[in-house]
Structure formats: structure tokens, C-alpha cells
Amino acid sequence: MAAKDVKFGNDARVKMLRGVNVLADAVKVTLGPKGRNVVLDKSFGAPTITKDGVSVAREIELEDKFENMGAQMVKEVASKANDAAGDGTTTATVLAQSIITEGLKAVAAGMNPMDLKRGIDKAVIAAVEELKKQSVPCSDFKAIAQVGTISANSDETVGKLIAEAMEKVGKEGVITVEEGTGLQDELDVVEGMQFDRGYLSPYFINKPETGSIELESPFILLADKKISNIREMLPVLEAVAKAGKPLLIIAEDVEGEALATLVVNTMRGIVKVAAVKAPGFGDRRKAMLQDIATLTAGTVISEEIGLELEKATLEDLGQAKRVVINKDTTIIIDGVGDEVAIQGRVTQIRQQIEDATSDYDKEKLQERVAKLAGGVAVIKVGAATEVEMKEKKARVEDALHATRAAVEEGVVAGGGVALIRAAASISVSGLKGDNEDQNVGIKVALRAMESPLRQIVINAGEEASVIANTVKAGEGSYGYNAYTEEYGDMIAMGILDPTKVTRSALQYAASIAGLMITTECMVTDLPKGDAPDLGAGGMGGMGGMGGMM
């Protein structure tokens, strides 16, 4: 086991604070509408330019191991805030730095660290309640666009695109962000159910100019099995041919003789058929086939429930107004499924989302809800260069997360005003701890709540103390707009922060800061020295062996 370097008390805390400050100082320059960019060097390719706090935090590793421990703990604050609300990473870092700095000063002055932490926790619990009281619902187009704009660093185009996307696919809908091909940002909405499976044979293509298959009012056969024998399908194919409609086959796979026969019949014009693989794998595939069945009023032909392909009739087939299939995707538009049955299926999946533990499962279930309930929106980000494209895409993703958070828990006045009002309410209510050290902890937390506003003002090149005092003297959502450099009602000016983002930033900052204030010892590996020289010089002693003769 490697030897360890151990530091105690103030020595440990000073080193840790130095690391905290390096990381926080790098991150906080990005805060606010006039925040600056940070350039990140990459081992290959062009440097990345970003205003995203968590991207900056993730890049920072310090040489000194004790300082690095401090930096990594604050990195955790940014990362947790990002995971919870998708935004507020810089605010969380600024709050953590302030609480840690003030808290360690109090520890150095002889306060009890555990009581300080308890005081900080009390203040944060009270502040979260105040934020909930201030919160107003965010449901209309204008408010959603404003939240998106603020989170995308005052880019109005992005705010409007996100609001449009939410309007078209619903607040539960799937909205994805992709790199576009032009200079302009674009919004593509795919109505109906889309899944990532393309045609099984290019010979099914009936629109050569677009390389796609279009089926008007097709029957849809859903089979939870591999189809390799055409005999199984003959009864269904004959019934479909008599009905004079096209047929889409969605199965685990269609192969060999079955696929060849379908291709030949399609090319001869006997029956119009297309085949695709079912989406997903294992249990997820079964569930998604059932989703398609609900959407198209069909039945999944599965031997598990005693249904056989040979006995399938037209009543077992689903129907839709139109189906479009290309090399990679299939879109089913306007399935004829019963609205009540579809809503029941959506409710069932939403219950599964609540019960799901992994983020991956939740995301996949959310996608299924969106596909059943309305569609998928894709925001295509446009930019002149790849460097700008990457930076902008990260901003749009942040804005999208923030907007979802706003719809979920409502919004509060932005620009750091909500935290200042929360701190003022706590001061007026006279929140007290069990002893004097806890009271100091409460004051540390309340003072930290001013730090986001101060940092926004500093980044705008103004005098922080003057503006902070003016805002504190106001009431409600009265604050300072750093973008236009004027005072006014923040909500009326459209400067809004999602309640969830502000709440998460404060809670995670206080959590990690509390742990750091109560740190008394730090242990790390000693740097490995040069390995001793194990040369063969010692063999010279063998010269004396001549006397053995």
C-alpha cells in the first residue's frame, strides 16, 4: 500500500479552499447575460469555447492533490445541479464558494463546525420554503420562451424555438437537439409514431426520388416472432390482396424465403408490402409492439398469448392513415386506435416512469409516452463553424432542461433576486438556531444568497455593493437587469429563473459546503519518488569465489 500524506486542521482547510477558489473563479466568469466565455484546450481538434458552467468545471484538475480535492468537491456541486435541473450550475458553484469561504472564516475564529453546518441547513430549508411561496406557474408560450431565452444566455431565437417545440408536441413530448447543416436554427416536428428501424429490403421502395416507401391507408401486421416461412403468412396476404390495401409487417425479423417471396410479389404488383424489424430489444420490444397495437387498433400476434400467424385475420391487423419508411426510420401517421385506449396506455407508462429507478429507463419510457401522445420535435442548431456549433448546441440543451424545470415547478424572479427576497424574509421572520454558533451558520447562508446577484453585476462591469443594496431596498420581483443596465420588475421584463433550478443550486451548494466546513483531516497518496537503481553492480563480489577451488 502506498504511503500517505496527511494534513490536519487549518493546514488542510487552507489547501482545500485554494482548490475551491481556482475552480469557482473559472466557472463564475460565465454567470449572467454579460458573462464571459471560457476557452478549453482539447488534446485533439480545435479548442472548445463555452459559457456553460458545468463544462468548465469538468475540465479542471489541479496538480496539488489537496487543492484538487477541494476543486473536485465543488465540481460535484455543479454536476449534481446539472443532473437535477439541467441548469444553475454556475449559480450553485458561486453559492458553494461563498458558503465555504465564510464558513471556514468562522471555523478559524473558533466556531463549532457542526453547529455552523446545522445553522446553514436550517437557513436553506427556510429559503426553499420561501422560494416555493414566490414561485408562479409557467405554462403559457411567452413565459416558456422567456425562460428558454434567459437560460440560453439571452438568445431570443432559442427561447422561441423551445416554446414552439413544446407547443407542438406538448410539455411531455420528446424534444431533441441536433447539429444542423445550415446557418439558421430550425425546428422539425415529426407527427405520429417514429421508431429507428428502416426497411428490410430496398426492393420495397416505391418513391425512388426520395429513396423511401409510402403506404396509404395500410393494414399493419404486428408479430412478436421471426418470420422465415411464407406459408404462415399466406392467409393474411390473400385477405389483404382481396381488400386491395397495402400491408406493413412489423416483426422481430423477416428473413429467407418469406422476405424473398414478399419482395417478388411487391415487384410484380400482386400485393403492396413493406417489412421492418420491430423497435427495441427483449421486453422493451414487446412493450413497444403493444404501443403500436394500441395506436393502430391492432393485435400483437404472439405465441405467448396463444395467437398464431396462420390463424390471423384482417380483424387482428392495425390500420393507419399513412406510413413512411426510409433506410433508418419508420413513421406511422394517424393510427386508427381508440383515443380512450391510447390515453389508458399513456397513463400506464407514466406510472412506470414514476416507479423507474434508472435515468435511462425513465428516458426510454418518456419517449414512448411522447410517441403515443403526439410526436417528436427536433431542434436543429445552425452555426457558421464547428466550434460555434458545439457551444450553441450545449446552450440550447441547457435551455431545454431549464424550460422543462420551469414547467414542472414554476418560475421565480431571475437575476439573483429570488434568493435575495428569500434571505430578507428569513431575516424578518427572525430564524434562530439553538446556540450562537448556529446563528452564525444562518448568517453565512443568508450572506451567500446575495452572491449570485453580486457576481452577475461584477460580470456586467458594475459596482456590486451599490446595486445589491438598491435591490435589497426594493420589494417583490424588483431587481437589476444587467443586460439593459436598468432596474425594474424582473418578471415583467421577462427575466425568470425556474424555481427548481434555483432550489437545486442552493440545496446542493449547501450540502457540499457543509461537508467541507466540517472537514478536519485530508489524506492523499504521497507522490512516488524515483525508483531505486537496481543495477547489477553487486555481482562483483563473486570474484572471491575463486578461493573455492
Curated annotation (Swiss-Prot):
Localization per record: Cytoplasm
GO biological process, one term: protein refolding
E.C. code: 5.6.1.7
Keyword Nuclease in record: no
Any matching Pfam family: Cpn60_TCP1
PROSITE patterns in UniProt: CHAPERONINS_CPN60
Family recorded in the similarity comment: Belongs to the chaperonin (HSP60) family.
Oligomer status and interactors: Forms a cylinder of 14 subunits composed of two heptameric rings stacked back-to-back. Interacts with the co-chaperonin GroES.
PANTHER family reported in the protein's UniProt record: 60 KDA HEAT SHOCK PROTEIN, MITOCHONDRIAL
Name of the protein this chain belongs to: Chaperonin GroEL
Organism: Pectobacterium atrosepticum (strain SCRI 1043 / ATCC BAA-672)
